[in-house]
């Protein structure tokens, strides 16, 4: 058990950045804060930080730990796990990674249906809306060409997962598509 150097009588906000693998570390930090009795009243995040922020709002630590301990590349995007591991571990030449990236982009981008499926499985819009923890995410409007700060609890019912997905988009690697419910392109 950690002895906090933080005033546990106060409430704090978390800011969670994007960057794939950082997501697992964010969940570990959340676990440590929870065990230390630190109260969180707001979360702001982008990309993986937005998804983890949703899990924090839902108070689903066990689900988050399980998700991150078993996560593979193919659970996020339509790719071959072995090939991705070779590229990430430097076991394939850099030019092959560049070639793969350009091939995916020429085909319209990598399909992120697996990420959409994951969001459908883990995100409970009602739990987030009823949470005492506020959540704000960052995305980018392609139509308006500007960053957007979104109060996730204020989005129209049924659109929460679309905004979380938009925050996680990696342009131009992921298939750029208009989020049909939103009607505008976001990345």
What are these regions (language model features)?
Residues 1-46, 54-184:
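Patatin-like phospholipase
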């Amino acid at each position: 058990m950690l002895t906090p150097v933080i005033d546990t009588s106060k409430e704090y906000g978390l800011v969670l950045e994007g960057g794939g693998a950082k997501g697992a570390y964010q969940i570990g930090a959340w676990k440590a804060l929870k065990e230390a009795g630190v109260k969180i009243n707001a979360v702001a995040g982008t990309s993986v930080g937005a998804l983890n922020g949703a899990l924090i709002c839902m108070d689903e630590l066990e689900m988050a730990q399980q998700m991150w301990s078993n996560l593979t590349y193919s659970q996020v995007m339509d790719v071959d796990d072995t090939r991705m591991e070779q590229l990430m571990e430097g076991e394939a030449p850099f030019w092959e990674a560049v070639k793969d990236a350009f091939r995916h982009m020429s085909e319209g981008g990598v399909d992120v249906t697996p990420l959409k499926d994951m969001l459908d499985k883990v995100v409970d819009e009602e739990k987030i809306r009823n949470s005492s923890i506020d959540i704000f995410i960052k995305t980018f409007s392609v139509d308006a060409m500007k960053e957007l700060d979104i109060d996730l609890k204020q989005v129209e019912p049924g659109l929460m997962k679309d905004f979380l997905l938009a925050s996680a988009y990696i342009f131009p690697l992921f298939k750029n598509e208009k989020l049909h419910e939103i009607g505008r392109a976001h990345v």
